[in-house]
Amino acid sequence: MFPSLQSFAKKVLARQHVSIDHHIILERCGLWWYKAPISLDCKHMLIKLPNFADGLDLNTALMLATKENNYQLIKMFTDWGADINYGLICANTPPVREFCWELGAKYQVDKKKIMHIFFKLIHPSTTSSNIILCLKLFNDNPFSAYVIIREIKSCIHWKLKKLAEDTNVLSNISDGDMLTIYCFIVALQDNLREAISYVYQHFKYLNTWWLTCVLCYNKVFDLHHLYEKEKIRMDMDEMMRIACTKDNNFLTIYYCFILGANINLAMIASIQFYNIDNLFFCIDLGADAFEEAKALAEQRNYFLISHCLSLDIYSPDSSLLTLKEADPNKIYHLLKNYKSKSILAYLNYDVNNTTL
């Protein structure tokens, strides 16, 4: 199907710099999207929009237009050179699928194209804009989410495995929600604030998962936001257990400690997850369940931990017991240069006894 003269004229116009005074012309010509003019960078074939700072390549723009059932833009982007088979990926209603087929799409969705777009958006140096776009394209898109989850399942379970030791918890999550959680974790790890805020705003029904993720990934400021501002609640000791799933999670462990979580349960959880730095941090905070902890370590053949716990050389670090409120700024500054008093005691004991 050949592009219409009208589409060609729009393409030429989209390449021009048009002053704000003439934006009404662009709007009436259909060169308007997300309350902004559609601009085309022909060198890189990118659609430029304020909402997507990185720009959208034509195929991705086509997918988004299809997801939004925007027939005019579907036709225009296809005329400009987008591959209509990408549009079919996001065609979630029979009329839109029919329209894509009329424009030349194959009758089956190409799974390789789904993965191509996903990995183009989600990668180690991704941006907030990319994560938001990924969620727009693939959330509420059951087939695409199914394809992606099956392809990256091992990676997702690696990121989520300690968040949910009970595998039934993961099995009860839909593919779409699991993909959303995965994208959120990527945003958390890279501190992509715009994407994180977008998730908080648009996926409130997953709030318990957001609390779980920020506990696990040691994000004390996000934890404070969710707990104090959003009023998301969970059993205090369960919050502490989740905070103990990754080693060196001192910020979120301390936050839960100030809220009143049982530090002895945190001591036990740290052994369960074999997180030795967390264990010594709990001892610094006053944990004293040494007999129970030692028995668990021996049961699991954690001989180093068992040996550490058999020594009567530890005492709480009084400098850590000064805060009375769960203020993330104060917690951050208190622990910024934290060195474990208990680890130092163990190392000194070990050196002295080795010398002897």
Curated annotation (Swiss-Prot):
Please classify the protein's predominant subcellular localization into one broad category. host cell
**What membrane topology does the UniProt entry give?**
Single-pass membrane protein
Residue ranges annotated as transmembrane are 249-271
Classification via InterPro entries: Ankyrin_rpt, Ankyrin_rpt-contain_sf, ASFV_MGF360
Instruction: List the signal peptide residues.
Output: none
**What is a biological process (GO) this protein takes part in?**
taxis
Q: What does this protein do?
A: Plays a role in virus cell tropism, and may be required for efficient virus replication in macrophages.
State the UniProt keywords alphabetically: ANK repeat, Glycoprotein, Host membrane, Membrane, Transmembrane, Transmembrane helix
Q: Which family does it belong to?
A: Belongs to the asfivirus MGF 360 family.
Q: Which organism is it from?
A: African swine fever virus (isolate Tick/South Africa/Pretoriuskop Pr4/1996) (ASFV)
Please list the residues annotated as glycosylated. N172, N352, N353
Q: Report the SUPFAM superfamilies cross-referenced here.
A: Ankyrin repeat
Map the ANK repeats onto residue numbers.
57-89
Q: Which GO terms describe its cellular component?
A: host cell membrane; membrane
Protein name, as recorded: Protein MGF 360-10L
The entry's localization annotation reads: Host membrane
Q: Does the keyword Zinc apply?
A: no
